[in-house]
């Protein structure tokens, strides 16, 4: 498939917590869709090595969820550094979208952007400065058309690739049911 400035990059990170000043990225996944939200390519799904000290700093919620999903074990066994993850992800994205063209797409994507800005700046700079945040649409629908919220439910696996797929499906739902386009 050719590089297309209209393609959209969807990203999800799993982190050790919510504070970029103390927490770290432990998983990244990316998908590329066309502008109609059809998935055209799946990028690498990477567990990013972090030290036992960093992992021990996770709060109970993160210990439980990332432990049960197997992510903590994958992170401990990983040979992938943050720099490796940046390079592999950019190599993938550059096959489908020119640098600076796609907004960063996903759920609560502002949080992911904060971590990319702190730890993976070269990757953050690959995106346009705008965001397509499914969470924003969800919050508006919850307030303006709460009955519509019953039509979509998420599994919330807190695994990066599954979370991205759910974000795309959720945006497809809002497009059809709310925007009617």
Curated annotation (Swiss-Prot):
Residues 8-171 form the Exonuclease domain. GO terms for molecular function: 3'-5'-RNA exonuclease activity; nucleic acid binding. InterPro entries: Exonuclease_RNaseT/DNA_pol3, Oligoribonuclease, RNaseH-like_sf, RNaseH_sf. It is an enzyme of class 3 (hydrolase). One of its GO terms (cellular component) is cytoplasm. Keywords: Cytoplasm, Exonuclease, Hydrolase, Nuclease. It comes from the Bacteria. GO terms for biological process: DNA metabolic process. Coiled coil: none annotated. Its main location: cytoplasm. It is found in: Cytoplasm. Transmembrane segments: none annotated. Pfam families: RNase_T. Its EC number is 3.1.15.-. The active site is at 129. 3'-to-5' exoribonuclease specific for small oligoribonucleotides. This is Oligoribonuclease. It comes from Shewanella frigidimarina (strain NCIMB 400). The lineage of its organism: Bacteria, Pseudomonadati, Pseudomonadota, Gammaproteobacteria, Alteromonadales.
């Amino acid at each position: 498939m050719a590089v297309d400035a209209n393609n959209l990059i969807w990203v999800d990170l799993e982190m050790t917590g919510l504070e970029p000043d103390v927490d770290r990225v432990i998983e990244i996944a990316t998908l590329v869709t066309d502008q109609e939200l059809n998935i055209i390519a799946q990028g690498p799904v990477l567990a990013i090595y972090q030290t036992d000290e960093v992992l021990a700093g996770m709060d109970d919620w993160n210990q439980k969820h990332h432990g049960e999903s197997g992510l903590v074990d994958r992170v401990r066994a990983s040979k992938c550094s943050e720099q490796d993850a940046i390079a592999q992800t950019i190599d993938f994205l550059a096959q489908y979208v020119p640098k600076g063209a796609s907004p960063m797409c996903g759920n609560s994507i502002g949080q992911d952007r904060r971590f990319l800005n702190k730890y993976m700046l070269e990757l953050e700079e690959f995106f346009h400065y705008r965001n397509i945040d499914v969470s924003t649409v969800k919050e508006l629908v919850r307030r303006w058309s709460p009955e519509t919220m019953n039509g979509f439910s998420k599994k919330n696996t807190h695994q990066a690739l599954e979370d991205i797929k759910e974000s795309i499906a959720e945006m497809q739902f809002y497009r059809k049911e709310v925007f009617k386009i």
